[in-house]
Amino acid sequence: VCTPLDPLKNLTKLERLRLPNTSDNVGACDIQGLTGLTSLTDLEVNCTVQDFSPLQNLTKLQRLMIYKGYSIEGSTSLEGLKSLTNLRELTINLWDDEALSVDLSPLTGLTKLQYLDLEIQSNGSGPAATNLSALGNLTDLRNLVLHIDNITDLSPLRNLKKLQTLEVSTGNQETITDWSPVDHVPNVTKG
């Protein structure tokens, strides 16, 4: 379990915060102490976050990076991110040794996003992320990194006309048979 973040709750004018990885950050991280930091525009968290709801009031956030999401069990809800409509950069890394399922639909309203990096990996047989169609609304995206196990369909990316760079890794390249929906993207990396 990570160090409690409650001592930060009175720093209401804080605009940038980086919570580095420490030996205390090996388990799930309770980010409840961040709820009152409504002036934050830039947040980087290097510990396992399973509940994103404490972030829902941080509506000034323009850059959010969540790393080290190891050993998350079952499904993880991104629902707490849907009110962060000023986000321009979003990075989320979630990994699990068992089956992990993440619904991407809460991201559909984040239409100011220009950079999105989703690394969602699971040892389960189903897709690690569902509802890739939610990304089709993100028409300002210029850079997209998808390291998501077992995705098969890139057609939701067809309308992302501003996309300049796309990096896709599915854990098994044969899962994607049709790359034509991203023919318009100048730089595509299949890995």
Annotate each language-model stretch with its function.
Residues V1-P7, K13-G33, S39-P54, K60-G80, ...:
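Concave beta-strand-loop units of leucine-rich repeat
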